[in-house]
Amino acid sequence: MFTPVRRRVRTAALALSAAAALVLGSTAASGASATPSPAPAPAPAPVKQGPTSVAYVEVNNNSMLNVGKYTLADGGGNAFDVAVIFAANINYDTGTKTAYLHFNENVQRVLDNAVTQIRPLQQQGIKVLLSVLGNHQGAGFANFPSQQAASAFAKQLSDAVAKYGLDGVDFDDEYAEYGNNGTAQPNDSSFVHLVTALRANMPDKIISLYNIGPAASRLSYGGVDVSDKFDYAWNPYYGTWQVPGIALPKAQLSPAAVEIGRTSRSTVADLARRTVDEGYGVYLTYNLDGGDRTADVSAFTRELYGSEAVRTP
């Protein structure tokens, strides 16, 4: 039996940038829409058959461009299909008692330099998502006090996607520390209102669920179930197999989760093989860094796509 491993580096949740916070806060407060910066149409990527592969990147320490360096030896397709910027935060303004979207200086740098840090991946055919994470301040996806408050935060998210030309948003309900700063505990309506509003704002973008925290277990309220508003959901425990508890088809689920460089290659391969054997359509990886991870990536590409991976330095 695999031992659950949860080693996400928390510096993305802890490193604060007042300037970035003020910029986002003032935009939200004024109600001004961000100027759209649409992603360019990707160049036709070599066709590959098999599950969608996902790479989370800790941008406090690593470059998003590493995701595009790995391709398949057979056919030249991308080893990774989705790259996730880890991570923006949901913060709490104690003065206005409202949640707001916050970017630390490293996330802000990636977004500000989208032309060089994001567009090359998109032009290669890789989707780029923004992960949003709690920040120990009591604000989270599961404790908005009203539909209006949830919708206001959804607008901040969709404005950021439009402004920076992203392909979608990933929800990760960790480190919120509900109750801090006098905030409320999770309620049943909050996440439903948030996801409903976000999907209405960006009907053609990706919304994914890191299947953890109070939000992940509160997907229905008042006769509304938001499960089908997600494009993907994945297991959050690296080195394990756990089917996300959400009503999505197998093609949109990743029961497998691995941490590159920490999960053994044999386990990486076993989980990839099981993904194919049991008909699941997504394979999640975390913490791709700037080292040569060809052997680690090949451990799953052999099973998912029948090919070794190659790395372009």
UniProtKB/Swiss-Prot annotation:
Signal peptide: 1-42
GO CC, one annotated term: extracellular region
Keywords assigned: Glycosidase, Hydrolase, Signal
Active site: E174
Molecular-function annotations in GO: mannosyl-glycoprotein endo-beta-N-acetylglucosaminidase activity
Statement: the UniProt record of this protein carries the keyword Signal: yes
Name of the protein in its database record: Endo-beta-N-acetylglucosaminidase H
Species this chain originates from: Streptomyces plicatus
